[in-house]
Amino acid sequence: MRDGTTRVNTTGMRLKTITDVLIKLSQSSTHYDSAIFTSHKVKKFNLTTNENEPIEIWVYDDTSSSFPILTEYLKKHLESLIAAANHIFNRNEQLKKHWHETLVYIKKALEERLKFNIDLKQARKLVRDLINEIGFFWINQQPTMITTASQLYKGFLTKLFEAVEIAIPDYKRNHILVIQQTGDIIKCEYYERGTSRSLRSNVENALIEYRFAENTHESEKTKDFPSAHYRGKLGLCNVATCFSATFDANNETTSCKIYYRHASFPPIDLYPLYRQERKELKNTKQRYLKKKNEMEEGGKAMVNWQNRAFKTQQCREGIKLITTRNMEMLRDLMRKNRSELELLPAERPPLIYTNISLLTVKQWMDKDFQEEQYHDTILAAERLRSRGNRENEDKFVPIMFNFGVNLQAKWQRRKSWWRPSLPKEQVFENDRAFFKFNHLVIERLQLIASKKTFSFAKTQALPHLWELNEIASSWNRYEKTLDCLANAYDAACNNYEKDPSKENIEYLQECEEKLSQAKKNLWKVADTHIAFYRKDFKQLIANRSNFSNDDSELQAILKDWKMFNSLYLRDAWHDASFSIQTSIGNLTRVVGSELSINCKSADDRTTGFCRRFEGSEEGKDASSPHVRNDTDGGSIKFTGWAKTKKAKAIAKTEKKIAEAFSTHKLKKAVVAKSKIPTSHSLISSSSFWKLKAPDTSPFLTTNLPHSLSG
């Protein structure tokens, strides 16, 4: 043809595989020798199999090319990318807009970066930057797993730009780039011409040769290409069968491998499977045809395939080899019944969750997830709500909160503070992750409850608040629930002022009752955790049988205490109530390098845990908003609303802690730095200061209507 394109029509020929197509192509020696390897331009072969499936093969020979040719090369391949992408996206109206935006960006990046000549070093850097800018794109045609634009064509563009980088002239070798289009699927592969490696048809060596051309010398020395070299590069491959072909060019043997996949075949992550299941993968095509027939009968074969392919431990481990940006997302989703899940990219780009429905989220949350999955689940649910589906809010919020309540109950049944089968650090990490989830639920509820005229606050928010508060009684997380209850009460007061109806009065009284009960629960939690805290710290000391006043012994004990405090108490207890924060703060507050326990008498201990700061100005500052340093002796005294019977009981607990120290003759201790956060505590929360002292009307704000204030 005049444009230099050779078109081979194989219609009517009995070609069983794509291998036959390539062999037929190799027999056309005139076209092969003159049109491809003697030219410095890109050539395209349009082939058609006996199934009338179009296949485009593009071959590029780099013998003495310059960078401007690469520009033309990229643009030509971009046309194929655009054509196939449009074909896919036109089927889905939701993705049309997103694909257009991505397409404009790709065009702009190519035009700006490839319109002028640059030297070799700059060219390599340019290609790397281009890969990073555009990102990895991945085709996925599963109907229930439509991904976002940032993931489409991941494999295609990755291989395309890597091929460009390899084709830069300083490699001094000829390379073949093959782009194959089968229906909606485009595959791009490159191989080095003239290598001595024998042709192999199994998937294992196809993956090895995938990166072979990039580092030839290293590959020739080590027959098996080091897996670490292409770790994270493969990603998920839409591959069912690997075909091989050989054809002679200029008396050199060239290997060409083409990955072929039917559009409806499920994606397989070949990397974790090719070692353990390579024998099985040789028969992938036969197994696929069998599964396809079964699927036409019952529709269950594809689900069975996915369950078997993704539930294995080898595959979950292989997920770690994928690019960092998708690793966390994929790790949580490689579970059974994967076809019912949506993909959750870790970076959560703006286009995320375009295909999630309310029903999908509900089904999602009803499943028996592993513990580490709750966080992404709740984020997905929140993204769905914030995507503009305001009309679904009344339905959506109860689903989310029910999921939270059920999950907390599940954790409560399974959790133990010191699980013997797990290291302490892992238990602490799990607890911290759980509390993050609890905050997400409560913050969302707080927003709902603060709406002045939102009917959901009356019918659903308060019951959910109370359920969360009851569960939180054993999870040391009251400050957020109390904030929510206070905001709900404020909203009830405002509603009553606007409309003093019977319904609003009942709702207001219910809020007041719940708020008062929540305060009682707070004191109960404080007592429980103070006792637990004292017991565990005593145990830390008791474990040191040969305890002495030697500094090394003290440092060893306090090192254990630092771990115990920083990993557990700081995150899990400090925000529970003022009493926990006070008792821990008195022990772990950093004041220079030393903490001197200087209790003059037993009476001093009744007012608080005695301490004196030596050589530090920090001793003059209050350790928390509700306590202050007494200048005569350095003891801590409670002020304001903390002067209650409950505070005195807590002071007695602190006295016992002090006695535990004096029993072991602790006079000086080098305390490791451990900052105690107060910004999130109940004491520092704005809603707390709205609440009156216990000796007055319990937990009522100044906005209380006169008819209810007594």
From Swiss-Prot:
Keywords: Coiled coil
The keyword Coiled coil is annotated on this UniProt entry: yes
The organism of origin for this protein: Coxiella burnetii (strain RSA 493 / Nine Mile phase I)
Any one of the GO BP annotations: symbiont-mediated perturbation of host actin cytoskeleton via filamentous actin depolymerization
Taxonomic lineage: Bacteria, Pseudomonadati, Pseudomonadota, Gammaproteobacteria, Legionellales
Keyword Coiled coil carried by entry: yes
Protein name: Uncharacterized protein CBU_0041
Coiled-coil stretches: 273-298, 477-528
